[in-house]
Amino acid sequence: MSKATGFIKEFRDFAVKGNAIDLAVGVIIGAAFGKIVDSLVKDVVMPLVNFILGGSVDFSNKFLVLSMPDGYTGPMMYADLTKAGANVLAWGNFITIIINFVLLAFVIFWMVKAIYSARRKEEAAPEAPAAPPEDVTVLREIRDLLKDKQGS
């Protein structure tokens, strides 16, 4: 067998029989789960937070201008300033990302907690004890008969 054929066989064994398939499935499911969590935060949690706080939790347009380009007369918006070359400390965007992270972590925590709780309930369901093997049953009957004989 040539080295190329051996390499191809080795790669096929790795890709098909190894953990590569499990890893690929995990990555695909993880990506899909990420979209679910992202939608849950953006489409459900954030609107509720915005409603409760009475406005938008978006500080991305809060910033501190450290230096302006000479002769700049455009709007004082973050996107316009950075496009013009202004040195801007975007603290508001940082705060918004932190808030989003905390909310996302909170949602994931509750989802995982619910999944583990459901698993524990499944595991906690007691199984009916298995019937003893026939030889054990026969030995118990013999024991009981011997006890009865000794007692009489």
From Swiss-Prot:
It comes from Bordetella parapertussis (strain 12822 / ATCC BAA-587 / NCTC 13253). PANTHER family: LARGE-CONDUCTANCE MECHANOSENSITIVE CHANNEL, MECHANOSENSITIVE CHANNEL MSCL. Belongs to the MscL family. Channel that opens in response to stretch forces in the membrane lipid bilayer. May participate in the regulation of osmotic pressure changes within the cell. It is found in: Cell inner membrane. This is Large-conductance mechanosensitive channel. It is a multi-pass membrane protein. InterPro entries: MS_channel (IPR001185), MSC/AndL (IPR037673), MscL_channel (IPR036019).
